[in-house]
């Protein structure tokens, strides 16, 4: 082989950036007006795909917005690209790294209750927490604590809501 010496040259023109277009992307997430928010955290870990779908179904029954904890926005679990791009995003984070909200009803499913998250939901009217760990900090922040795994509890809640034909207006 033959070694060829190359000395790159960079001039001012090489360093210029030209903006071709700008687009403002509006968030589709609304935590200011919903009466109900269902949030989920790392408790989805046993079956992330199915558990996110359960949260989605519960939120639909309650006409609720869906929130997440900060760790979820960092995509620690594999779910379909549709669910990933819809829910596991920074726009949905409740807490010091995201939104502060005050719905009438806040359901925390699989949320441990780190103080950063609690800051974002502490002004909620009524808080229901679902967590298998009875020592989870969220227990001290809720009105009703349901000890159980979200995949066991949420289907029962959905069934009961349907039985009672509960309607929550937006």
Predicted regions and their residues:
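N-terminal glycine-rich FAD/FM-binding segment characteristic of electron-transfer flavoproteins
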Residues: 1-170
């Amino acid at each position: 082989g033959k070694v060829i010496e190359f000395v790159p040259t960079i001039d001012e023109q090489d360093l210029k950036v030209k903006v071709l277009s700008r687009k403002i992307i509006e968030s589709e997430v609304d935590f200011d007006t919903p009466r109900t928010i269902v949030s989920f955290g790392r408790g989805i870990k046993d079956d992330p795909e199915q558990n996110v779908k359960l949260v989605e179904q519960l939120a639909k029954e309650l006409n609720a917005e869906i929130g997440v904890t900060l760790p979820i926005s960092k995509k620690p679990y594999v779910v379909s690209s549709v669910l990933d791009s819809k829910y596991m995003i920074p726009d949905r984070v409740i807490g010091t790294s995201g939104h502060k909200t005050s719905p009438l009803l806040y359901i925390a499913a699989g949320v441990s209750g780190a103080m950063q998250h609690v800051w974002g939901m502490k002004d909620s009217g009524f808080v229901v927490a679902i967590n298998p760990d009875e020592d989870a900090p969220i227990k001290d922040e809720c009105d009703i604590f349901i000890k159980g795994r979200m995949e066991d509890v949420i289907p029962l809640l959905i069934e009961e809501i349907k039985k009672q034909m509960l309607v929550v207006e937006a």
